[in-house]
Amino acid sequence: TVTPEQDRYLQVKKY
């Protein structure tokens, strides 16, 4: 599980 903040960071890192 990941928190909204972590998920957001992962999405940005994906790019």
Curated annotation (Swiss-Prot):
**UniProt keyword annotation of Protein transport present:** no
Domain of life of the organism encoding this protein: Eukaryota
Q: Name one GO biological process term.
A: proteolysis
Reported modifications of this chain: Contains 16 disulfide bonds.
Give the chief site where it resides.
Answer: secreted
Cellular compartment(s): Secreted
Residues of the Peptidase M12B domain: 14-15
Cofactor(s) recorded in Swiss-Prot or TrEMBL: Zn(2+)
**Could you give one GO CC term from the UniProt record?**
extracellular region
Q: Which UniProt keywords apply?
A: Disulfide bond, Hemostasis impairing toxin, Hydrolase, Metal-binding, Metalloprotease, Protease, Secreted, Toxin, Zinc
Enzyme Commission identifier(s): 3.4.24.-
Q: Does the keyword Glycoprotein apply?
A: no
Give the multimer and partner information: Monomer.
Q: What is this protein called?
A: Zinc metalloproteinase-disintegrin-like
Which species expresses this protein natively?
Answer: Micrurus corallinus (Brazilian coral snake)
